[in-house]
Amino acid sequence: MTHDSAAAPRGRQEPSLEPAPAGRPIAIYYEHPRWFERLFTELENRGTPYRRVHADSHTFDPSELAADDSVALVFNRMSPSAYRREHGHDIFYTLSYLGHLEAQGKRVINGERAFRYEISKALQLSLLRSLGLPFPRSRVIHRAADAVAASAGLRFPVVVKPNIGGSGAGVTRFDSREQLAAAAEQGLIDLGLDHVALVQEFIPARGGYITRVEVVGGRFIYSIRVYLSGETFDLCPADICRTTAGVELNLACPVEAPKAALRVESYTPPAEVIAAVERQAAAAGIEVGGVEYIIDDRDGQLYYYDLNALSNFVADAPRVLGFDPFVRLCEFLEAEAGNVR
């Protein structure tokens, strides 16, 4: 689907950065059918020209080596959880498309490098190691039969995480080596789309929450604590349904995945954590995204464990945060589009 929004007067009182020039829309490349409606609405309200580019029906001609001047830039919003919606092929196609765009000099936000980290939890841990940042002890496997041997030296419980994840897809906890062995023998270990997975020590969360830190333009914009319920690994902030005070979030419950047990609150991490998150984003080429970390309840150790180039803003953000991050995102996109010549 393609949509070029009409140029219209801005509906906001406060001053904003310069929008993209008329006739040079911002291309939003995406797959999920609903996650970006709030972004589209904000762009339309601001009169910012944009184009919807749906990954599933997209094609490109690799012989076209000159930069496409019909759009100012491309904002990659491809989701690694696409394979849960029968769009797994879109993921690998996107790698080729982003590489093609960047080879021809097109400005891409969250380009090929960012997306490679997005779709590889193994690469994320290697990045954390290169930055000297702590992460849970892990092993990388590509055969389920190797899971038990790979767990040697790890403290149980462990989790097996598919390399290509998204919204906690396929993450399974095993409380003992025997339980892991039985699952491997019965073919119950999910290695995910690329048949690569982590065997990773399970970290019990101090305070019962994890923390997600968001960046726009590679800089800290906000952070939230997400309070866990049971052993859920699906922590998409756009799907969380209530604040820590129990207030329902009206925009939070998609039809297919209500998570009414999850609670969220705004939180500002220590300066050293914010700096570490910004270092991760810069090293991974993630300009808009998020980083998740957890505090081990056993010893108070902080561990970073997930980088997200596609990180959805928390539902009903003005109520939770006190401001609308989509406004900040659109200002960033407009400024970047205005810098393209």
Map each language-model feature to its residues.
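Active-site nucleotide/adenylate-binding loops and adjacent lid/helix of ATP-dependent enzymes
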Residues: 2, 8-22, 27, 98-99, ...
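C-terminal active-site "lid" helix and adjoining low-complexity regulatory extension at the edge
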Residues: 264-268, 272, 282-286, 295-341
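Short, surface-exposed charged micro-motifs
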Residues: 212, 292-294
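Conserved N-proximal alpha/beta basic substrate-recognition cap immediately N-terminal to
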Residues: 31-137
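Short glycine-rich anion-binding loops that position phosphate/pyrophosphate groups of nucleotides
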Residues: 79-83, 164-165, 310
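Phosphate-binding site of ATP-dependent enzymes
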Residues: 172-281
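Protein kinase-like catalytic core scaffold
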Residues: 158, 221-222, 289, 301-305
